[in-house]
Amino acid sequence: MPDQLVLGDWETLRDDATRIRFTVFVDEQKVPAAEELDDLDAVCRHALVFADGLAVATGRLAPDGRIGRMAVLASHRRKHYGAQIMRALLTEADAIGHAQTYLHAQCHALGFYEKFGFVAEGPIFDEAGIDHRTMLRPRGAR
């Protein structure tokens, strides 16, 4: 079965997105479970990639242009699923007309986001016990 990318709302994609996020952020990275789900989920566009029928990657785009909650199951990393999610969310952001998109990148992942035209801004900061940097991308940058 070929990979499938799905964009949708929280009501539609919640179960699969939550499973991936809790596996990656709560179980692997030890982010407190209470911090993983938030009120933004209900108003974001969400993306999932399915491989062989299993949801393996997720991310979201907030109404203000912030991309977040990018996660790929460990068993499916280095297979470009994160890139599929990012391309879909950036296409969505550009179509909506955001002048720029931004995100809080875990420091170890800065290089991944740079490939999509994001540029790091400002100092390193702590978010959920993990070092992050803000990254910005002007509309249409590649």
Locations of the language-model features?
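Conserved N-terminal entry element of GNAT/NAT acetyltransferase domains
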Residues: M1-E11, A141-R142
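Conserved catalytic-core motifs of GNAT/GCN5-like acyltransferases
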Residues: H104, V119-T134
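Conserved GNAT acetyl-CoA-binding A-motif
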Residues: E92-Q106
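Conserved active-site tyrosine of GNAT-family acetyltransferases
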Residues: R21, Y113, F118
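Active-site rim helix/loop that mediates acceptor-substrate recognition in acyltransferases
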Residues: F22-D52
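Conserved acetyl-CoA pyrophosphate-binding loop and the N-cap/start of the following alpha-helix
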Residues: H76, H80-A88
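A short, well-structured alpha-helix characteristic of acyl/acetyltransferase catalytic modules
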Residues: T12-T23
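Conserved beta-strand in the GNAT
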Residues: L48, G53-A71
